[in-house]
Amino acid sequence: EISACLVGSEMCIRDSPILVNFKDIILYHLRRLWHFLRTWHWDGKRFYHLYNLNTKIVLIVTFLLLVLGTVGIAVFEWNASFAGMSVADKWTQAFFNATCPRTAGFTSVDLAGLGVQTLLIYLFLMWVGGGSQSTAGGIKVNAFAVVVLNLVAVLRGTERVEVFGRELSHDSIRRSNATVVMSFGVLLLFIFIISILEPGTSLLAITFECVSALSTVGSSLNLTPRLGDDSKLLVALLMFVGRVGPVSYT
């Protein structure tokens, strides 16, 4: 089963078995390698549709988020939270803390001790989340990529939104834009209400807790235990919305 369906001359991104496609890709290249070892003749045939569109988008965006997140965290925490560590440990910590905001929410440092810039990187990574059909939360890298591609097309003044030589369908663009707008709307509403219920609390800390809850990450600046009962219920509701609400269906 491929991950994208043709709609006229357009390409419509759907939920797809990315891991299955990735497995097929690995097996294909292993077979080519085994054929070369047996015959010492390299099979030059290429199957250009081996990588489906969804797999390409997820792999590329995930790679970029990991690289940029790792470099960004390393730059801002090199002589701060990572001070006293070896160079190898600093890069390991940076990579680990760039990966976990989009997945399990594990942490190897006290998040409350991180700089504002690093926390903003955390917020962005938590908000984007993982790929579709994964257990990660967020708006999904697929929706994020489509929205960015649509923005690029608008800035260029073109009506067609293309990637890898194929045009994305209006349905994919519409669903992705709706997901992003809905995510921002829910976050703004809950952040606004909690900021009223918790006067004097840092707006950045409230935002961090809300984004973490909606993206079902689990990271915290140790604010939630100090919240009032009403605010805790709102945070719990955000977790529920992030897991079973429309945001999770992208």
PLM segments and residue spans:
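Membrane-proximal intracellular helices of multi-pass ion channels
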Residues: 3-4, 9-10, 14-249
